[in-house]
A protein has these predicted regions:
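Short glycine-cluster motifs
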Residues: 78-83
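Glycine-rich, highly charged phosphate/nucleotide-binding loops
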Residues: 65-73
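CheY-like receiver
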Residues: 28, 72-76
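Glycine-rich, flexible N-terminal cofactor/catalytic loop recognition
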Residues: 1-64
Length: 83
């Protein structure tokens, strides 16, 4: 049995108006396995304010930890995860 490759989707955070979050972006946020966020607290707040629910694992990803997080995220993608 072959495993399918994961998917990486980049979603911009709406600034100033939560209504700017597209339905497609909302769908991806809900079905992701992992949410790699610059600030996980703000992402959780965004999801709460928009009423979105997710079972995704929240992981920080920013300038200070990118070097160590990239291999972990690539491994997750190779194992079929949606990030």
């Amino acid at each position: 049995m072959t495993q399918s490759a994961g998917q990486l989707v980049v979603i911009a955070t709406p600034i100033g108006n939560l209504g700017d979050l597209s339905p497609r972006a909302a769908e991806w946020l809900q079905k992701a396995d992992i949410l790699a966020c610059e600030d996980t607290r703000m992402t959780r707040k965004l999801l709460a304010l928009t009423g979105l629910r997710t079972t995704a694992k929240f992981v920080p990803y920013h300038d200070h930890n990118g070097k160590t997080m990239r291999p972990k995220l690539l491994e997750a993608l190779q194992s079929g995860k949606k990030i």
